[in-house]
């Protein structure tokens, strides 16, 4: 539990940064960043992921889980793609298909479809100026998705900044379900993504009996816990294996307020290793005073459980933010919602 939660914490450090050829990125992409979409144009549940290695090398992956109703086995297709980084448009210079292409199947059509996604996303993103906000709408004609659509571009989404595509009926034909960043060359988070399955809530979740109240502190900030909690590190407290609370200081990423906000949101909404933040089930609220509130639902594939994480950033007059994160298994959170919400509200 602790390992899964700690992997969500982040560092505000740029390593190698890139941009898609011909695109002016407000937030430069970092090596290892990725995005996954649910493509609702397929008859079966289908996901498409795009990963950036550097400014000339990418990976695109298709995944469809087993469809028992239609008796369809799990399906996967991965392609490594190289591009001309100096081009003003998406100019593929090579590719390597990493998965077996079966004769007499629709594999060739699927490969062409993935090619089209890359070319089309690049061309449509190139039509936009710098995307420096969330959910920027652009009405375009897109035959691949049924004609006239609204593409929502978003600064917090890496690579092409495409968040959702909505058709003329108001239906999402394609939607971002998670973003993330690989932590090392050994990180299999991108290749291991298999969607957000329906998981059984932990049957052993029990109502928590509040213990003796105690106030804990870190770096001048306090939160009210009780004797059920154990301090693991200077700034970390655990409630058995069910919950983990962390306090920290988050530095300002940039003096440009808008860039700072978008960058922090991208980092705090990024999945890490085998823990995937479910975008459609998560929210972020940036207040006028600069405070930020995140309510995130994530799926941890290692434990096959959903996790609810509340994150609060309180802006400091001296610069930076005081940060609180409370992560709880979903079953425990639902049974003890008022207990955990009270803890979050006590952050001062």
Predicted regions, residues:
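Sec-dependent N-terminal signal peptides
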Residues: 4-15
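Short, exposed beta-strand/loop patches in secreted or surface proteins that constitute
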Residues: 24-27, 49-53, 119-128, 151-153, ...
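Conserved polar/disulfide-associated segments of primarily extracytoplasmic proteins
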Residues: 88, 95-120, 234-317, 321-325
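Short, exposed beta-strand-loop hairpins at the edges of beta-sheets
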Residues: 152-177, 301-304, 314-316, 326-338
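Acidic, serine/threonine-rich low-complexity disordered tracts
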Residues: 20-89, 94, 98-209
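N-terminal targeting sequences that direct proteins away from the cytosol to non-cytosolic compartments
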Residues: 20-30, 34-36, 43, 194-244, ...
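Extracytoplasmic/secreted proteins, especially bacterial periplasmic and envelope-associated proteins
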Residues: 84, 96, 224, 263-264, ...
């Amino acid at each position: 539990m602790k390992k899964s939660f700690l992997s969500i914490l982040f560092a505000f450090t740029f390593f190698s940064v890139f941009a898609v050829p011909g695109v002016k990125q407000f937030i430069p992409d970092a090596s290892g960043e990725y995005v996954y979409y649910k493509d609702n144009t397929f008859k079966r549940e289908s996901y498409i992921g795009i990963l950036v290695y550097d400014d000339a090398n990418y990976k695109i992956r298709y995944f469809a889980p087993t469809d028992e109703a239609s008796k369809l086995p799990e399906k996967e297709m991965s392609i490594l793609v190289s591009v001309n980084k100096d081009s003003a448009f998406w100019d593929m210079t090579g590719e390597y298909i990493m998965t077996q292409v079966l004769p007499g199947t629709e594999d060739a059509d699927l490969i062409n479809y993935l090619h089209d996604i890359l070319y089309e996303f690049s061309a449509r993103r190139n039509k936009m100026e710098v995307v420096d906000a969330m959910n920027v709408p652009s009405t375009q004609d897109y035959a691949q998705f049924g004609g006239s659509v609204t593409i929502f571009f978003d600064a917090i989404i890496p690579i092409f900044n495409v968040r959702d595509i909505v058709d003329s009926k108001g239906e999402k034909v394609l939607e971002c379900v998670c973003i993330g960043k690989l932590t090392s060359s050994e990180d299999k988070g991108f290749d291991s993504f298999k969607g957000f399955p329906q998981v059984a809530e932990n049957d052993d979740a029990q109502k928590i009996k509040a213990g003796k109240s105690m106030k804990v502190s870190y770096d001048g900030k306090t939160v009210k816990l009780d004797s059920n909690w154990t301090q693991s590190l200077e700034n970390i407290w655990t409630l058995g294996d069910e919950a983990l609370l962390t306090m920290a200081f988050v530095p300002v990423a940039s003096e440009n307020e808008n860039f700072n906000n978008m960058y922090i949101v991208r980092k705090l909404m990024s999945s890490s290793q085998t823990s995937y933040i479910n975008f459609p089930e998560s929210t972020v609220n940036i207040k006028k005073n600069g405070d930020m509130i995140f309510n995130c639902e994530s799926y941890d594939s290692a434990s096959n459980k959903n996790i609810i994480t509340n994150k609060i950033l309180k802006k400091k007059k001296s610069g930076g933010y005081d940060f609180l994160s409370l992560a709880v298994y979903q079953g425990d959170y639902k049974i003890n919602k008022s207990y955990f919400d009270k803890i979050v509200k006590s952050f001062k």
